[in-house]
């Protein structure tokens, strides 16, 4: 709950109240919570950083990837199982975070119908990357070769279409 921004010192936050007002299982609320998890929870960040959208990854290969990243084998197996639990919740079914098969894990392009979720993702990205001037070109979101402290919202949400981004950004500026 803390990593999702919902609980601070055993009390619900203003963010939790906002999510409650929106409806816990709405795409908007799920998107906002997942954005917080992406930037505050190392396990969710690992999924984003290491699993590309639309690619099928054998669960055993994902375990090997985790072990190569110095995760203990037992923990690696647990992290792979946790992905299925996440995708079985509204994060997977409503937000479209991803899905699993018997053998594979897949991360999916999010369903984001509320541009405020994208705006929040951009805000958290800028904050995580300590970008004081808060200015960057759209191409910066797509460049995955840049070493930075936070995952690009393009990678996080699986939105790699420049025209889709332009439409979203124009919608935000209206």
What are these regions (language model features)?
Residues 2-174:
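Donor-sugar nucleotide-binding helix/loop cap in glycosyltransferases
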